[in-house]
Amino acid sequence: MTFRKSFDCYDFYDRAKVGEKCTQDDWDLMKIPMKAMELKQKYGLDFKGEFIPTDKDMMEKLFKAGFEMLLECGIYCTDTHRIVKYTEDEIWDAINNVQKEFVLGTGRDAVNVKKRSVGDKAKPIVQGGPTGSPISEDVFMPVHMSYALEKEVDTIVNGVMTSVRGKAPVPKSPYEVLAAKTETRLIKNACAMAGRPGMGVOGPETSLSAQGNISADCAGGMTCTDSHEVSQLNELKIDLDAISVIAHYKGNSDIIMDEQMPIFGGYAGGIEETTIVDVATHINAVIMSSASWHLDGPVHIRWGSTNTRETLTIAGWACATISEFTDILSGNQYYPCAGPCTEMCLLEASAQSITDTASGREILSGVASAKGVVTDKTTGMEARMMGEVARATAGVEISEVNVILDKLVALYEKNYASAPAGKTFQECYDVKTVTPTEEYMQVYDGARKKLEDLGLVF
């Protein structure tokens, strides 16, 4: 049966008021894991240890499983404790009418984001920045300037302000509103000081409420050529605050960046099951959020990292499948275990850059070093590595990529529990000149040499 009209956030709100009742425990502990397991068995999904898929028949089965996951489960609204269901025609309408390309930034600093494919020879867009990591107010500008100074970086992804005017940005307080506005204003000033005043940014990251996110669209702050973030909840869940934010973004004609990080070892379960949920989440981004692009980030439940063997496999298969069967634009965010100024951090980021570039990602977003939870532990050098590795990987045969990845991950995967803490931005850079220390440059060269030994050609 055909649909009455294209689905949007207003329809979501209406259905969230009348949908099937369900407790959150039943959703998290029964519906999601059981359906994911059922679909894995139904389609015989087995990735056989490949980071990037070479079996197109298996990719098609994965796409069908992800589509079916979304169709049969729907999305859980945490405010009303009800399930929002879509019809099959509504889902296909969203998939068939995605935003196929868009521009981030303005003037000579603008970049055109357009579809890539598995094994594409074109380098993906590099969105460099703290990626939601906490950054001290006194170094907020120089930290972001360290990314804008890197030519490998195309756009900026914001960090979180730990304070504004010396006060914590408490959700739903005046300070949250001030921080949401100040965050992007400072970053745009940092870009201007780096000689790139038209760079696009992605945020806001500091605010946690709808009023904070909405207030970031302001004079000198977020504009319609920036990526505006809204986050889905784990797994296949959302709250009504986010739906209100989507309504604002749509009404403002903003670029919408729908974000979600599926958890390996969490509610969905294992590798194949989590990838099914990841594919469903990508599709949900374009129907629920009217997303311009989806920011992925499979993360390991134990290590809090996106760079493990399991999470790279999930990311590689999900992206390749979405790229093969849809025009949905996709990015991935980076959370290494190790901190800045360490070889392990750079190698972790490199493994993910290789995976994302080869699997067809349009945007690489990072790097949130030290798992993105330690204040000031993120610098532009990690983004440089992400970009250089992406350039070296673009166009390499997938079979060769899988061999390189297997060897690369083996170099660091036994060290998660003892990952080096690394150094803060203030220890890695001259804060006044915003230049890396000699020590970090030597560490960088050492990591680059190891990548060359594995077969990457810079």
Curated annotation (Swiss-Prot):
Catalyzes the transfer of the methyl group from monomethylamine to the corrinoid cofactor of MtmC. The gene is mtmB2. Keywords: Methanogenesis, Methyltransferase, Pyrrolysine, Transferase. GO terms for biological process: methanogenesis; methylation. This is Monomethylamine methyltransferase MtmB2. Gene3D superfamilies: Monomethylamine methyltransferase MtmB (3.20.20.460). One of its GO terms (molecular function) is monomethylamine methyltransferase activity. Its EC number is 2.1.1.248. It comes from Methanosarcina barkeri (strain Fusaro / DSM 804). It catalyses: Co(I)-[methylamine-specific corrinoid protein] + methylamine + H(+) = methyl-Co(III)-[methylamine-specific corrinoid protein] + NH4(+). Pfam families: MtmB. The keyword Hydrolase does not apply. Pathway: One-carbon metabolism; methanogenesis from methylamine. The keyword Zinc does not apply. It is an enzyme of class 2 (transferase). Belongs to the monomethylamine methyltransferase family.
